[in-house]
């Protein structure tokens, strides 16, 4: 079975601080049964804050999903103990025995008729047959989903669900072997970091940001600047004269081409800064925070929440159309309103900007949402 990339986990774990439990729910892996290799389950670092929770590449993990061959079986009064091997390691799985309905209802005092006795007997025989055919022995393939725990200083899985895998031609095992490397690449080997520290890390690592990272950081700083100065409109050139923003946009950036890192030289700093400003403003436009009535980087930008003229025009469009028979009952759909804005105002307005204006008008009780993406004004 293919091996996961364990080097990243081994190198990153010692230097990374444990993420506070408050943020664990932000990682989808925390609530899922993580499909991990047994070797990784055995090597995961246990949380110091919440025993019973483990970390792989920063991902908090409580429950796992494994599939492998049974190499040992121990039967106890209330549970089975299976040693499961997936070709990367062996782990013990505690699987509780299923309660038999026949045993719980076979009390002669409860069974009053011969017919009930006969049905109970037949049911018991059926259950015995099923148990015989599904009995798990050495060499069988088993799938186990459960929580990871420590018992006598050894890590094991306490099963919530377990069953014998009927896979004579290896279809399920091959599918699993193909699935796990993709999960590792897309999910488990992508480190989960403390959201509270991400912005701080970005600020501390400005010199190592690529163009996309620097653009995202600059867009946040522009947003803060516009809010602080309470600006209603601006030109890109105005922002370029702000020393703090210009200093950030002029930082050296790296571009990844495969494994090569090519740093832009100082001779191109001015052009790169303009490009970063343009991309940052484009990002704010995509979020609906700013807009242009006419497209072009040299055109005036408007702050969406500060543009009273835009709010009034959209309000009047909704109010007028709601008086028409086809919109009187349900109101106007968001896309219909956007189309009216493009036709009547000839403004290059995006859906994201319109959504922010509609939310603002609704907060002010100027319009109401009558259904999903439908709005009415009175």
Swiss-Prot record:
InterPro entries (UniProt xref): CST_STN1_C, CST_Stn1_wHTH1_sf, NA-bd_OB-fold, RFA2-like, Stn1, Stn1_N, WH-like_DNA-bd_sf, WH_DNA-bd_sf
Principal place of residence: nucleus
Subcellular location, record wording: Nucleus; Chromosome, Telomere
GO biological process, one term: negative regulation of telomere maintenance via telomerase
Annotated stretches, region: Winged helix-turn-helix (wHTH) 2: 306-378
GO cellular component: chromosome, telomeric region; CST complex; fibrillar center; intermediate filament cytoskeleton; nucleoplasm; nucleus
Source species, domain of life: Eukaryota
DNA-binding region, residue intervals: 64-165
Keywords: Chromosome, DNA-binding, Nucleus, Telomere
Region (Winged helix-turn-helix (wHTH) 1): 201-305
Pfam families found in the cross-reference section: Stn1, STN1_2
Annotated region described as Interaction with CTC1, given as residue ranges: 8-195
GO molecular function terms listed in the Swiss-Prot or TrEMBL record: single-stranded DNA binding; single-stranded telomeric DNA binding; telomeric DNA binding
Function: Component of the CST complex proposed to act as a specialized replication factor promoting DNA replication under conditions of replication stress or natural replication barriers such as the telomere duplex. The CST complex binds single-stranded DNA with high affinity in a sequence-independent manner, while isolated subunits bind DNA with low affinity by themselves. Initially the CST complex has been proposed to protect telomeres from DNA degradation. However, the CST complex has been shown to be involved in several aspects of telomere replication.
Protein family per UniProt: Belongs to the STN1 family.
Oligomer and partners: Component of the CST complex, composed of TEN1/C17orf106, CTC1/C17orf68 and STN1; in the complex interacts directly with TEN1 and CTC1. Interacts with ACD/TPP1. Interacts with POT1 and POLA1.
Full protein name: CST complex subunit STN1
Species annotation: Mus musculus (Mouse)
